[in-house]
Amino acid sequence: MTDVDHIIIGSGINALVAAALLSRKGDSVLVVEREDRIGGCMMTEEVTLPGFHHDVMAATFVLFLTGPAYGALGEDLAKHGLEFCHSPHPTAALRPNGQAL
């Protein structure tokens, strides 16, 4: 196994921000996740329509968008495709039958 400077267990938003900031300063980072996808509660999935992605467990991104992590990483994240869709109706509850509240 290759030596790394930091091993981070889990891949939720805090872990990924820590990994990105450590990597940006030149440290080597290994993120270990037990699930088959990264993101924790920030995971994005196609739930309703093909091509329309939902952040299924995230209630709000306000703390991230207004915090220092987004200030430090926002431009890099945008280069990799991150964009936010702002709406007057930012939340919904999807029912198993396809209806939404």
Briefly describe each language-model feature range.
Residues 3-101:
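N-terminal glycine-rich phosphate/pyrophosphate-binding loop and immediately adjacent elements
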